[in-house]
């Protein structure tokens, strides 16, 4: 009964929910749970490098399974809370841009909330010192399992020759990680729209990808 479920049904498309790291056990059809949530990145790394790699591998495995079933195009999406924070952190490090210029209001933060968000990202980056030349290190230290899984899907697209469509900001950050790991992945990544998050335009420009709509879903 979710909006995405209804849209998929109307368009005769299938949806595959995946549990990458929910804090509780779920009944989703595909369980790739790597941890019961990530850690507080303002106090230490969000996850271990091993967990980040497992997340990437889970995404690649999903593409392999769907490729074996005959799917010829895939799209990514996520349901997360607070994941524009991790995405802005990852984008800021990988693009070597100031946190203030890469961070937006997400689902509708107040001005005070935005300041707290920016400060939290700055603290996490200063504490963990992610290496901008090592996308997996950045993912592990200030990213999330949702981002890892989707980055793996984009990598899987390159491995199996299947185009993968980016959704919003979090999905774009995942695609950026995939491209930093494997530049050839770019040839299999398609943009659907550009998010209103400040970093979105810079990410698409960096990837050399063109979007066709400005969705602005929260307005």
For each feature predicted by the language model, list its residue ranges:
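Active-site cofactor/substrate anionic-group-binding motifs, chiefly glycine-
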Residues: 1-22
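Hydrophobic alpha-helical bundle architecture
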Residues: 152-167, 172, 176-191
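Glycine-rich, mobile lid/loop segments that gate access to catalytic sites or pores
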Residues: 37-83, 89-94
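Non-transmembrane, aqueous-exposed alpha-helical and coiled segments at domain scale
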Residues: 195-205
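Conserved small/polar residues in nucleotide/adenosyl-binding loops
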Residues: 213-219
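Short glycine/serine/threonine-rich phosphate/pyrophosphate-binding segments
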Residues: 76, 81-88, 147-150, 171-175
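Phosphate/pyrophosphate-binding betaalpha-module
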Residues: 86-143, 149
């Amino acid at each position: 009964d979710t909006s995405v479920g209804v849209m998929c049904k109307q368009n005769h498309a299938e949806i595959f929910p995946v549990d990458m790291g929910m804090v509780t056990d779920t009944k989703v059809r595909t369980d790739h749970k790597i941890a019961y949530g990530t850690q507080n990145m303002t106090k230490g790394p969000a996850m271990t490098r091993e967990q980040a790699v497992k997340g990437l591998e889970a995404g690649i495995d999903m593409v392999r399974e769907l490729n074996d079933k005959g799917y010829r195009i895939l799209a990514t999406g996520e349901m997360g809370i607070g994941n524009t924070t991790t995405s802005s952190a990852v984008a800021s490090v990988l693009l070597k841009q100031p946190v203030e210029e890469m961070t937006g209001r997400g689902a509708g933060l107040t001005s005070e909330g935005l300041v707290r968000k920016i400060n939290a990202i700055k603290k996490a980056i200063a504490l963990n010192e992610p290496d901008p030349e090592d996308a997996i290190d950045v993912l592990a230290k200030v990213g999330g399992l949702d981002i890892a899984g989707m980055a793996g899907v984009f990598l899987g697209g390159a491995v199996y020759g299947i185009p993968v469509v980016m959704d919003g900001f979090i999905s774009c950050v995942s695609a950026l990680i995939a491209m930093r790991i494997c530049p050839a992945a770019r040839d299999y990544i398609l943009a659907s729209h550009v998010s209103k998050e400040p970093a979105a335009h810079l990410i698409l420009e960096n990837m050399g990808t063109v979007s066709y709509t400005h969705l602005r879903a929260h307005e």
